[in-house]
Amino acid sequence: MLKIKVLILLSLFFTNITWADEPYVSESLLNEIGEKYKILAKKRFLALQQTLDSVKGKSDLEKLEAVNNFFNEVRYASDMKVYGKKDYWATPWEFLGNDMGDCEDYVISKYFALKYLGVDYKKLFFTYVHSTKFDEPHMVLTYFETPKSEPLILDNYNRKIFPASQRKDLTPIYNFNGDILDEAGKGNEKSHKKWDELKLNMQRKKI
């Protein structure tokens, strides 16, 4: 009887462990990154893990600020310059490994880091906008506390997080969240090809 109780308690204990208890950057991945991108990249990933560890258990806003600040230190560069492609959605490992990327890459890396930290992915959206300042299409990560809340904007152009009403330089076009579409069984539509490719690359831990 005692043995059964112990097994039940252990089962409950391990059930309550979230995936955030596992490192975002595993030791094997860290070694692969070191081999491909060398020591400075390895240090960047160690710094990322330290940043994420420092805000575990804190509020969503503190997590947003920490993740936004960390990834905004990465240099901006076009997909053509980094990957020789016109439009490519890089994994966080590629983005931080190269230490450069375009607006989609900032959004992707912030999204998956926040998801790892336990921020509800249903509050996070890849948001296509038009930047009136630069007169070009752009992407930002938006956070909705509730479906009716004014979203917060996480952007690589303006490094501070502001409510959407304070970003007059951005004209919203539409919001996108591939995980929500996948959950609804709509994740394989041709219009979401970039997301499907990204999912595969994330599963493979493409660096």
Go through the PLM ranges and name each one.
Residues 2-9:
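Sec-dependent signal peptide recognition
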Residues 18-207:
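A structural boundary/capping signal
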